Amino acid sequence: MEEPLGSPPAALSALEKNVAELTVMDVYDIASLVGHEFERVIDQHGCESIARLMPKVVRVLEILEVLVSRHHVAPELDELRLELDRLRVERMDRIEKERKHQKELELVEDVWRGEAQDLLSQIAQLQEENKQLMTNLNHKDVGFSEEEFQKQEGMSERERQVMKRLKEVVDKQRDELRAKDRELGLKNEDVEALQQQQTRLMKINHDLRHRVTVVEAQGKALIEQKVELEADLQTKEQEMGSLRAELGKLRERLQGEHSQNGEEEEAEIQPQPDGEESISDAEKAALDLKDPNRPRFTLQELRDVLHERNELKSKVFLLQEELAYYKSEEIEEENRIPQPPPITHPRTSPQPESGIKRLFSFFSRDKKRLANTQRPTHIHESFGQWAITQRDDGYTEQGQEALQHL
């Protein structure tokens, strides 16, 4: 029996993985390995030996598939739970603030009601006294003296003053309640303005940090360029020193040759120091032309090239920083997109067939065919074909359908 290439090693690697790292495709690899083991048992002991075991194994693999798929969904659920907890905490804080405000209003209202009740009780008492006095006046035939009449007028005047004072207190408390409401509205507006200012300051702080990083990077680049220029300057100075030494040697050699040629040439050379310098300059130019490492540019041209290179480097660095900044903003905007609500599956919908059942359906058909024909050769051919097609197409069609159902 020929086994399909690539399936057992993949299954073995899936078995060696950590439990938290398993995927649905690893479960399918394990199912393929179990199918191979079933095939070997059928070859050795027949189909009846695993007829009762196979449905249980299929059920266990289905449970494993569901658990693995849920494990991959767990991080997203944790994030949603954290967001829900945060919203609940904010809601509880808001409710607590409203409750405190309501309690304050209730306390003020209770105080006002108590004072109003006291004043009403005083009014009722005064009215009762007034009624008693009126009844006494009706039952008594004795006429009131002028002093008693003035006393009665004083009592009625006192009642009017009490009523006036009560009205003033009620109006004052009503004005205080309105002022408290206006003050609360102003406080809420101040809080909203402070929140907006906080967000604006956070954005400004982020931009300033970005600029500071850019400036620091530019400073580092300038320091590196300074070090490079200093190193180049040192090398140039060393080269100039070596050239000066060679020039001195050449001058000494020329002077020795001229001294050997005779006194006449020495006499001609001594009154013409400018000519010697011109000859030495010409020899130096000839020597430089023969030197393969002679400088091709002037010092000003070299400085211009280095300055242009530094400017281009700084521009490239700024463009890279801006590109990274815009990419981070796009990522933040994508993360701010509201996530769709979780899909609720109705309980009445029938449970779809899992990928494990589809994986073993072909093998179960081969098992029935083996029981009918009693020829093991058909099992070899069918299971080989099943293993190859399952390994090739299991990740594309059946696996994807199983994932969609889950």
From Swiss-Prot:
One of its GO terms (cellular component) is cilium. The lineage of its organism: Eukaryota, Metazoa, Chordata, Craniata, Vertebrata. It comes from Mus musculus. Its main location: cytoplasm. The gene is Rilpl1. This is RILP-like protein 1. GO terms for molecular function: protein dimerization activity. CDD domains: RILP-like. Residues 294-359 form the RH2 domain. Residues 262-280 have a biased composition (Acidic residues). Keywords: Cell projection, Cilium, Coiled coil, Cytoplasm, Cytoskeleton, Phosphoprotein, Protein transport, S-nitrosylation, Transport.
